[in-house]
Amino acid sequence: MKEIKHFINGAFVGSASGRTFEDVNPANGQVIARVHEAGRAEVDAAVQAARAALKGPWGKMSVSERAEILHRVADGITARFDEFLEAECLDTGKPKSLASHIDIPRGAANFKVFADLLKNVATEAFEMATPDGSGAINYAVRRPKGVIGVISPWNLPLLLMTWKVGPALACGNTVVVKPSEETPLTTALLGEVMQAAGVPAGVYNVVHGFGPDSAGAFLTEHPDVNAITFTGETRTGEAIMRAAAKGVRPVSFELGGKNAGIVFADCDLDKAIEGSMRSVFANGGQVCLGTERLYVERPIFDEFVARLKAGAESLVIGTPDDPQANFGPLISLQHREKVLSYYQKAVDEGATVVTGGGVPEMPAELAGGAWVQPTIWTGLADGAAVVTEEIFGPCCHIRPFDREEEAVELANSLPYGLAATIWTENTSRAHRVAGQLEAGIVWVNSWFLRDLRTAFGGSKQSGIGREGGVHSLEFYTELKNICVKL
């Protein structure tokens, strides 16, 4: 059986304790690999290796030299595309058609985009008068923040991990990555690519394990970690924030959400259905930017519900190797239990189950997988659990509205504010409503269109800070002002 070890100081090493845990294929419930669980000793070794690497060749390289190496990392991912694809789909169960189009290409792009971006960032400079008349010049320089603790999620493992590692390394930092215990494969595989690309030992380190009383907690509590970036649940973010408060270390969080979509009667209904199908059901609904609440203007409500129902029922459920499949399992049986508990809550609270609401019949060899049906509800009160709480599954509640102001109020009614979608052909309305929505990202007549130069992050309880483009540089560097008297 495959054995996944930590990657520390340029080498794959096991845990001194010998403790391991199972990595399970969510499509069939079979064990893929045994993964070493890091203790405090392994986490400390990784952090110290990262700290030492800051003073080694990596810390002495120019921006262009680092960029050249990161381009080789990106090329290494592309050269081993099929290996990364197989590993990502084994860990997540997602269709290969999805991972080959989004996850793996973006994993490579995250290194190239940020390497090139940093090469072209201008610095500010100001002349000033001085009391003696000689003058002075102020100019700003960016310096690496230091050792970055990266805690990445399981839904888009390679994409979201490299989204943090790419800019962190481009800025000259070193990293210690704690991937989700559910999806360790591509993070480990990236260690091999880093070695081959000539990344110095200690620059990229990986420790495997869980959160509380395990690698995640040990990493966030470590005093030699200079900053922490995390994607995951709001509750976990709160715990990390408490740990980071000791030492007053900066954090960047992308947290939970309960994203809303607003569909106006003047929309292009074909596009609204296609976009909503993706935003609700893509990746099994396990997308932080996905839509779990849809507000549809009353004149088109019935038609919209009927067409989204037909779309949900047309999804082909299957394994990553099924070329026809476009809907895979959830990440784990544990997560399935959570999602199914909300399916039951919806019924208990009086929902009309438009479609789904249970577990699909699967062949015997897949019976151990974490399968659920795509699900749509209507008829619930605005305060119902499935309307107000993040489920992170392939489901949504659809509610009619009559006035624009009502739709905005409903969309803004929760303590989350990550993303939103608007479907309308009225340009003035699109701009007006987008400006009123309390969300970090608003898509108009689209979903998941991403330009990596733009700001990414959530408002309210959906996050702290922004990453993407120069915003990533603001988090991963310290800005120093130098004043020179003439």
From Swiss-Prot:
It is an enzyme of class 1 (oxidoreductase). Pathway: Aromatic compound metabolism; benzoate degradation via hydroxylation. It comes from the Bacteria. Its EC number is 1.2.1.85. GO terms for biological process: benzoate catabolic process via hydroxylation. It holds the Pfam family Aldedh. One of its GO terms (molecular function) is oxidoreductase activity, acting on the aldehyde or oxo group of donors, NAD or NADP as acceptor. InterPro entries: Ald_DH/histidinol_DH, Ald_DH_C, Ald_DH_CS_CYS, Ald_DH_CS_GLU, Ald_DH_N, Aldehyde_DH_dom, OHmuconic_semiald_DH. The active site is at residues 254, 288. The keyword Oxidoreductase applies. Keywords: Aromatic hydrocarbons catabolism, NAD, Oxidoreductase, Plasmid. It catalyses: (2Z,4E)-2-hydroxy-6-oxohexa-2,4-dienoate + NAD(+) + H2O = (2Z,4E)-2-hydroxyhexa-2,4-dienedioate + NADH + 2 H(+). 2-hydroxymuconic acid semialdehyde can be converted to 2-hydroxypent-2,4-dienoate either directly by the action of 2-hydroxymuconic semialdehyde hydrolase (HMSH) or by the action of three sequential enzymes, the first of which is HMSD. Belongs to the aldehyde dehydrogenase family. This is 2-hydroxymuconic semialdehyde dehydrogenase. It comes from Pseudomonas sp. (strain CF600). The gene is dmpC.
